[in-house]
């Protein structure tokens, strides 16, 4: 676990309680619970928190070899309000093109997907072969 990461860093008292895992296919997922500290509209998750979690999940998926890839762009689509409570996030690579890795993911609750995201992640120059 990272010490200083804004999403999962244990030194960040406001980091959402998200711990990601990766399956054999490279899909990153997390089951977590967001409470009042992450509230935007009454009873619902702040949209910026959803974007933060998805940026992190997509970035984890984009870096299966342990080499970090940095967000080049991210597009977030809010399908409906995300209620506070138990949630699930998933992300996976959709394709690669040179130094660019394309990923897609979502957050869902017990009624289905609430937020979707797509991102392009770039391998930094210092890590290119």
Language-model regions, residue ranges each:
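Conserved short histidine dyad/triad with adjacent acidic residue
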Residues: 33-39
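HotDog/MaoC-like acyl-thioester-processing domains
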Residues: 82-84, 94-129
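Non-catalytic linker/capping segments at the edges of enzyme domains
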Residues: 1-31
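Intrinsic-disorder/low-complexity, polar/charged segments enriched in Ser/Thr/Lys/Arg/Asp/Glu/Gln
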Residues: 25-29, 73, 86-88, 102, ...
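Hydrophobic beta-strand-centered segment that forms part of the acyl-chain substrate-binding groove
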Residues: 57-88, 93-94
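Residue-level recognition of well-ordered beta-strand positions that form the cores
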Residues: 31-33, 75-77, 90-92, 106, ...
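A short, polar/proline- and glycine-enriched secondary-structure boundary/capping micro-motif
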Residues: 40-43, 126-128
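Active-site helix/loop of acyl-thioester processing domains in fatty-acid/polyketide metabolism
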Residues: 24-27, 37, 44-68
